[in-house]
A protein has these predicted regions:
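N-terminal, intrinsically disordered, polar/charged segments of Gram-positive cell-envelope systems
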Residues: 21, 63-160
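Long, contiguous interaction/targeting segments characteristic
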Residues: 21-22, 44-50, 448, 463-464, ...
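C-terminal active-site subregion of NodB/CE4 polysaccharide deacetylases
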Residues: 123, 129-136, 141-142, 148, ...
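Membrane/wall-proximal cationic-aromatic binding patches
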Residues: 218-232
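Metal-dependent polysaccharide deacetylase catalytic core of the NodB/CE4 family, i.e.
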Residues: 167-187, 231-232, 240-247, 254-426
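Sec-dependent N-terminal signal peptides of Gram-positive bacterial secreted proteins and lipoproteins
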Residues: 40-62
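Amphipathic coiled-coil/heptad-repeat helices and related helical stalk/stem segments
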Residues: 115, 204, 364-365, 433
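N-terminal targeting leaders characterized by basic, low-complexity, disordered sequences
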Residues: 1-32, 38
Length: 506
């Protein structure tokens, strides 16, 4: 029968399909009512015997109708569930697409942000050209207003820069910094020397902060003078905006000599878990602390906080001897060969370190030196044996230089800078000449530094660069504070733990 046919699923209300379905259902209902009237007339005119059959037929029809309705409901429910599943799938697909787009946009934003951050860091260190090139070469530059605005700002700042007179670049230096004044100034025979030529960490930090606030910026002497492959020297260029003043920084004897053990100084330079340069310091109970206890890590931390204290990544110059090794590592061959004239400090140290390995010491020292160079630090010879080059013979200078090149150069990658020990110089003459200069020049040295109390002393000649340095130590702060006024106020810096009067020289 027609009414037994499964009905099609009900469309969603409000749609054209629903209206068509509704008309169809009304027409079918009308036809069904007509049939039911006809059937009732037949049933009334039939004999009683057929009544039972009619009732039976009605019951059967009723059951079939219920079955059809049930099937219709099931079909509608299945269709509805199918539509729901399809809608959920479409929603999930759309959500996934949106997530991909969002993640892509976030990734692009991160990359763009990283590029801007790198450019800003370069600009803070006065490397405007490199910052501008970095942004202009970025694929997003054409559509990034932030990048274009940054380039405009860098170009405007660069336009304010002027070339600093190279003959007016000052050079300051320190020795190893005192961490514990109670040990350095404990009244023994070494106190006077420490008081004269050393600086405390507290003094150093105050000086650094004051110089930064005055606009001083660390530069490399290799920014001041350039060397070609033939050893010829030409003037460099230092471009700084108004209010900034360049200076060169150096530190002598960064070897952590045996005689300083137990006197309140760091014992070596090491790398921490992040690869940053730190110091080791031996506490009273023999335990070892790792921290920022000397110039190298203190300057590194300061530049991390104040990038504009460094000109294009420059740090300072670390001057090394070699007879006790370098950077706190016992890297000299004498620790292994143990000649008959080995000094008492080395003998004692070797007795306390029976597991000594020259190869391990050199490997560790080179690792630290490489990390320092990566941060912008430069190395210099301080002569292997801390020699007074103005007084020793040419033969002694040659022998000493050979030891330095054999024991130190391989660990630091070589150097063409020599910082003379004892503050001396090759000669007192106006210009370098003579056998000692020719020998050192032939050994590859192009940059020469002595000690000079004047504010500036710079010579740039065809074959060498020469610069005087100013000692920022107890002696200078106590006796000649007026010579330091361009840098800081000595009275505000002077450590109250330092014994006074500071012993005079000589």
């Amino acid at each position: 029968m027609e009414e037994n046919r499964p009905r099609r699923s009900r469309p969603e209300m409000g749609t054209p399909e629903y209206e068509e379905w509704r008309k169809c259902m009304l027409e079918r209902r009308k036809k069904r009512l007509q049939r039911e009237r006809r059937n009732r007339l037949i049933a009334i005119g039939a004999v009683i015997l057929l009544v039972a059959g009619g009732i039976s037929a009605g019951v059967t029809a009723f059951k079939e109708k219920n079955t059809a309705v049930s099937q219709q409901k099931k079909s509608a429910s299945a269709t509805k569930e199918s539509n729901k599943t399809e809608n959920q799938k479409n929603s999930q697909d759309e959500s996934s697409k949106q997530n991909v787009l969002t993640e892509a946009a976030a990734s692009e934003e991160t990359v763009s942000g990283d590029t801007l951050a790198k450019a800003d860091f370069l600009a803070q260190q006065y490397n405007y050209d490199k910052a501008i090139d970095l942004l202009k070469n970025d694929p997003d530059y054409g559509s990034s207003q932030k990048m274009q605005n940054a380039v405009k700002k860098y170009e405007e700042t660069k336009a304010t820069c002027t070339a600093w007179p190279l003959e007016e670049v000052t050079h300051v230096f320190y020795h190893i910094l005192i961490k514990d004044t109670s040990k350095a100034f404990d009244g023994d025979y070494k106190e006077a020397d420490y008081n004269q030529v050393m600086t405390t960490i507290d003094e150093f930090n105050k000086i650094t902060q004051t110089m930064y606030e005055k606009g001083y910026v660390m530069v490399s002497i290799k920014d001041m003078a350039k060397v070609d492959e033939n050893g010829n020297i030409t003037e460099g260029e230092i471009l700084l905006p108004p209010g900034k003043t360049p200076f060169v920084l150096s530190q002598d004897d960064v070897c952590y000599y045996h005689y300083m053990d137990g006197d309140g100084f760091a014992t070596k330079l090491v790398l921490d878990e992040e690869g940053k340069v730190r110091n080791e310091y031996v506490e009273d109970d023999g335990s070892v602390s790792v921290g920022d206890y000397d110039m190298v890590p203190l300057i590194d931390r300061f530049v991390e906080q104040h990038p504009d204290f460094s000109y294009r990544g420059a740090r300072g110059i670390v001057a090394l001897t070699g007879y006790n090794g370098i950077l706190g590592y016992r890297t000299d061959e004498s620790y292994e060969t143990r000649p008959a004239d080995l000094d008492a400090n080395k003998v004692q140290w070797l007795e306390e370190h029976p597991d000594f390995s020259l190869e391990k010491e050199r490997t560790a020292a080179k690792k630290v030196a490489d990390a320092m160079k990566a941060e912008g630090w430069e190395f210099a010879s301080h002569t292997w044996g801390h020699q007074n080059v103005g007084q020793i013979s040419l033969e002694k200078l040659q022998s000493d230089t050979e030891k330095f090149k054999k024991n130190v150069d391989p660990l630091i990658g070589g150097t063409d800078i020599i910082i003379f020990a004892f503050g001396t110089d090759l000669t007192n003459a106006a210009d370098y000449s003579g056998d000692k200069f020719e020998y050192l020049k032939g050994q590859g040295y192009n940059y020469y530094c002595n000690v000079d109390s004047s504010q500036y002393f710079v010579q740039i000649r065809d074959r060498y660069f020469r610069q005087g340095r100013r000692n920022l130590d107890g002696y200078r702060m106590y006796y000649n504070p007026e010579l330091l006024e361009d840098l800081f106020n000595a009275k505000e810096v002077f450590d109250s733990a330092r014994p006074t009067p500071v012993p005079p020289m000589g």
